[in-house]
Amino acid sequence: MLGCKGVKSRNNAFERVTVEEEKEYNFRQNFTSRYNILYNANLMLENEERAIFQGTSKNFQIRQSVFDEPIGDGDAHQLMDSLIQKAYKIVNSKQESKYVNEAYLIIGKANYLKGAYHNSIEFFNHLLRTAEEQQEYLPLAYAWKSRALLQIGKTEIANKMVDSAFMTLDDSKATRTFVNAAKANYLLRIGQELEAIPYLEYALESNSKTLDKYRWQFLLAQLYKDNGQFDKALTYFNAISKSNVPFDMAFEASLQRSLLQGGKYDSADEQVRPLLRMLREGKNDGYQDQILFQAGQIYEQKDDIAKALSYFKKSLAQPNRSNYQATETYLKLGDYYFGEKQYVVAQNYYDSVATVLPADYTDVNKVRRKLGYMNEITQLYADIARKDTLLYLASLDEQGRGEKVNTYAND
């Protein structure tokens, strides 16, 4: 009997140890499970951002953006909906509060990437209310909320949110990169280009993502060029043209570099020569319209207007020309002939713009407004010129008037 009790006592002790070990095992298993969910969720978010980048048609002739925005409108999205459900498991379990805020951030980002901006704002708001003990989440939540507000047109509040992100910023390089990029994004969206440049430079300086590195370098090159800082633009275009980037990006960087390097050539013919070599390279098939237009710009820059016009018209004559390039060339010719007071010719080019103007053209609404008022202006000037001609003819004697009419007829 005593032996039996002793055995029973040892069994109880063994059972207690087993229970404790099982609790420890379950804790570790739950910890590992939650960690894996969050790790995989962040990988899924990165993959979705890459998919948005790859799914967006890239035209490097137009102004690039700081971020590629989702094309969805909040409808069902299998991958993001699955991610949201997994993150909800952590939110609902509440066994490890240190992971709940990460889960809320993931859910907010996933809603953003599927285009459900109002939903994403709600989760970023919740994170802002609950992250007092994990303040590293505050700048991220503010910056993401700023992006979402921009997407729904609330620019004033978006500005306040991104400013709040700076007030709560920590030393994390990734966070600093995103917050500076979000500020640059806001400023560009409201048209403050010069103010955006320093923030984009800061974002580039601390950035570790290759995808963003080249995009932001190219955008900075465009911003510097458009704002007259040609040396800085050339530095970035040079770097991009020599980097392992998509062909279209490298091609456009090379074209822009050819225009900005005018100071190193003695003549326009010498500067254009590398472009003419590009015309003969098979890899540039389909890009001849852009190359010829760039050659025209170089001659225009050197005040050789006859050759400039010749190359602009050659660009338009290419059978595989792009609508974007055709728009740019028609506008260039329309503006030239308007300046030369050849209003009918100018209007013909402006009318041609309307037939090819793509929806993604840089400042497309500004171009549409220009076409509207240029039509009115060219008609007005043409009427004035016609009346001036009639008054001039009326001032001549009969013989002189007849000679002048014959001259006009022959022209």
Which stretches of residues belong to each language-model region?
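Acidic, polar-rich low-complexity tracts and alpha-helical solenoid repeat scaffolds
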Residues: C4-D411
